[in-house]
Amino acid sequence: MGSRSFTRALALAFNEWLLMFMLFVNSIFSYVIARFADYSELQSPCLMCSNLDHILRRTKDLKKTHWDIICSKHKSEISSLVYCHAHGKLVDVRGMCETCLFSFATTNKSNAETYRLLVGKLGEDSHFGSKSDRSKYPNCSKLTDCTCCNQLWTPQTAATQVAEREILPKIGLLGKIRTGKQSAPKKSVSFNHLPDVGYTELKIHSDTESEAVFSDTEPKQESSLNHLPPVGYNEPKIGLVGDVRTGKPSTPKKSVSFNHLPDVGYTELKIHSDTESEAVFSEDECVVLKDEDHKYQIVDLQTHPIITLPYDLATDKLLNFDFPLEPFVTRNDREEVQLQETNWRTYSSFPVLIPVNDVPETSEKVFKEEEINSLDNLFLTSRAMKHFAAAKVKEEPIRLQDISSTPDVKENPANASLMEETELICLSDVTATSGAMEHSEVILKEREELIHLQDISVTPDFKENPANASLLEETELICLNDVTSPLRAVEHSAVLLKDKVEPIRLQDGGSLTPDFMENSANASILEETELICVNDVTSTSRTMGHSSVVLKENEEPIRFQDSSLTPDFKENPASTFLVEETELICLNDVTSPSRAMEHSTVFIEEKEELVRHQNITLTQDFMENPANSSLREETELICLNDVTSTSEVAETPEDVLEGIELMSIHDISLDEVSESVTTNQTSVEISKERDTDQADITSLESEYIVVPSPNSMPENSTDNCVSDKKEMKETSLRISSLSEMAPRDVTSHTEAALESESSSFNSMSVAAETNQYSGELLDLADAYNIVVGNEGHYDSNGRQQIENWMKKDTSRVSEDLKALLTQISASRGIEFLSPRDVSPKISVNSSDQETKNLDHDMQLLLQKRMLERNESNLSLEGVSVTEIEGESEGDRLKRQVDYDRKLLTGLYKELEEERSASAVATNQAMAMITRLQEEKASFQMEALQNLRMMEEQAEYDMEAIQRLNDLLVEREKLIQDLEAEIEYFRDQTPQKKNKLDVAEKVTEMDSPSEGMSNKIQSCLVGFDEERLYITSCLEKIENRVNGKAHDDNLPAQESVSELHERVERLKGDLYFLEQVMNSLGHGNEGVQFVKEIASHLQTLRSLSMKRQDQTEC
């Protein structure tokens, strides 16, 4: 039994592995087929169609269908996919829009209701869609992309928000607009508290042939009878108010009921209309709500309709939301939702109402003669709608952009009462967030309505109406163009908005025409109107807090841009009172941080009217008019150009300017003004390029001013001081005139930089002018006292000195500024600052090239001072600030602490620089040491390598010498052997034998004599060759020995000497042989003897040659 189970397990395992292998092969073939189809640009094969079961017709054994092959995981994924007939895509149903979802109506119309019911039960997920799409529409966070067509749409959520009964406010709007009557309430509306999903069933019937039916299921009457309503539930019935034109109410035909399901609530809304146009609700319906406490909310009902249309009109009418909706109208106790024939729509984008610019032009009776550009940010209140009902004779919209009021509207007394009681404010810059709405509820008090009128041009007909004068008298104007609107600014602005404060934002308007000036009723308006320019005031939370002190009762600022004073305005006696009481103060050069606001509050008291007239052209009629002389006499032009607005100055500018004689307008001619404009244009353009950091440097430099010493002051010092004062005033007037001609869109930060630049310029000019007399340092208060004490001595000499100072060459200015900056840098440690931040760009009657040269000289001077500071190691300890008259000890200590802190900051910077320099030097030294060590190591390695090579060469040479010595020894042995053999043969030759053989040899001598001679010659040649070989070897040895003579190799010399001896022996042997050869001629015995010797020598020679070849190889 066990063997069978084991065998079966092995068979199953084998089959499993075989199946896995076949699947792997199948997957490879499928991949290759898909790639080949893509490469050939053919249609990719279908997974189902490519199966052979469709062709082979599955057998009875294979009862499974091809759908059963799919695994459970992929079945769950496929179950949520829907095919879009419009785009041919198979995508997730939970992320499809309605266009793709109902595309089945174009192909299959039989199962439309079943398919729609299935989709409705599936529901839709609200988590689809990217965050980037939602960021584009911050007010509609539910927008998402369709998974099929990537179009924005609003999905239905499972957790539908339904308004609760206890917090449901009353819904109200206008009744009859033309008749001014409100319709009576019919029924109340209540909402069913559904747990999960609420579907709205919207059914709209018409008396005409065209009819659009909206339902969720086919049974229409059973939907309201399935369940009994709960306790406290009121079934609403919605009727219609009659035609607006006839004023007759229409009777309601059908009612609205709620289907009380345990899980899903369906709302059935049936609406009848007498017109041909059909009204269709959008997906996100909302209403504007107003409760008894005058608080405004927007409740999102989110009752999304399930749409049912005839099959032939499914794709056309399902997504057409361009139908106009009528407003909802309610009353006190009983509310009734009504659709009237006015062209209004409601939306659910909280808190901003989304405008609809594509309103169809079907109803011609609405929005006639009006140009509608936008309807967003519109809040309709009950009080505003009452006024709107009185003024809505021709059905004009409340907020109109770029609308010119016609004379008919202005002459109507009803419109005057409307505009008198209407409070206008511009909240276009307020961010529309929920937090901002919570803060804005503090500002929105009773009797404050929100209407935005942009670009309204007040025509003469409106001004001539006496009823409108009271409106302009009570209207208080404020310009909030440059006021930013964060939440903190809104909190601070709540202090300014009191009861009866109605600000209006008039853009590009307010041109005072002669008709407006001639009206006596308007004179009182202009007299009570206080004008101020808040264009240069930054709108941070701190400045708003300070500005609340300045803005007191009856102070209403208006910004008039490019207002030209015409001759009619000047000749009008009523307008002279306004101009006489108006004080013109130039605040262009006043810095606007919080400290400047603190000091400026001393000047601004009650009934001070600050007017900034930009680009005012003083014509000849204005100068010659005697009525305007009072204006020029009483007008005070105060230049605060030279007054620093920091808290470090002890005396306020008010104390300094009390005794200064101020120059009026009639003292300056138009020619001088134009000349000053052309003269200082270059300097102002250069000053605009300064950075905002110059303000801090100005605060440092303005504390010390070089003035003449009292002991060494010459007689004409008073005139010089007076000339300096006049010069400063003329310069400030010129700069102010140029700044008024500057563009209006310059930000407050740039103006602050210009103000600090001008202040630094004047302080530098005073120091440069007075530096030629002495080099003592005085504080700012003493300098002003000297100027004030020498006032009133303006004469021709003073004016001449001013002109001389204005015309002096640039080199003089450069030298004075160099000396001044030298003293300041020595006392204040100005070397810590960069040359770019310190060098002032001043140009007085000079060109741009001279200014650049001056700036370059200043940079060179500062660099020189920095080098001197580093070389001398000057200590900054013990430097104290000068005492200011009337300053308390605490303030002086504070200034001392601030000054010491700045010095410590500079010292810390210098210390950090030295630390960084030492660190760099240390790193460089370490790098150099490392490099030297590497070079030393490389040299050592190279020396060791060379030494090793020399040792190897010496060993090789010693081996060669040893081989030569061995060769010589062998040769000597050979020679000795030869000699021994020769001696042996000599001893063995018997005399008798020689005698017997003599006769035989004599007989043979005749014939072989020639052959024997040849043999002997050959033997001699062999000996000669051997001798030459031995000689060459000896020469080589001698050369080698001579080359290595410095080694003092004694064994080599001994071997050479032995070789010489052997050579000598060989020579002797050769001589012996020659003698033997000569003995051949003495008979047969000599010949036989020679033959034997020759044969033996030949054998010896052959043996020696073989051994030599072996040794050489």
From Swiss-Prot:
Q: What happens when the gene is disrupted?
A: No visible phenotype. Myob1 and myob2 double mutant has no visible phenotype, but a delayed flowering. Myob1, myob2 and myob3 triple mutant has a significant height reduction and a delayed flowering. Myob1, myob2, myob3 and myob4 quadruple mutant has a significant height reduction, a reduced rosette diameter and a delayed flowering.
Localized where? Answer: Endomembrane system
User: What keywords sit in the KW lines?
Assistant: Coiled coil, Membrane, Transmembrane, Transmembrane helix
Q: How does it sit in the membrane?
A: Single-pass membrane protein
What sequence ranges are listed for the domain GTD-binding? Answer: 888-986
Describe, from its UniProt entry, the tissues in which this protein is expressed. Answer: Expressed in leaf epidermal cells, roots and root hairs.
Query: Could you tell me which residues belong to the region Disordered?
Result: 209-229
Q: Which domain of life is it from?
A: Eukaryota
Return the GO cellular component terms, semicolon-separated: membrane; transport vesicle
Checking PANTHER family in the record gives: MYOSIN-BINDING PROTEIN 1 (PTHR31448:SF32), MYOSIN-BINDING PROTEIN 2 (PTHR31448)
Domain commentary? The GTD-binding domain is sufficient for myosin binding. The transmembrane region (1-61) is sufficient for the membrane targeting.
Assembly and interactions? Interacts with myosin XI-K, XI-I and XI-1.
Q: What is this protein called?
A: Myosin-binding protein 1
Read off the lineage from the record. Eukaryota, Viridiplantae, Streptophyta, Embryophyta, Tracheophyta
- Coding gene? MYOB1
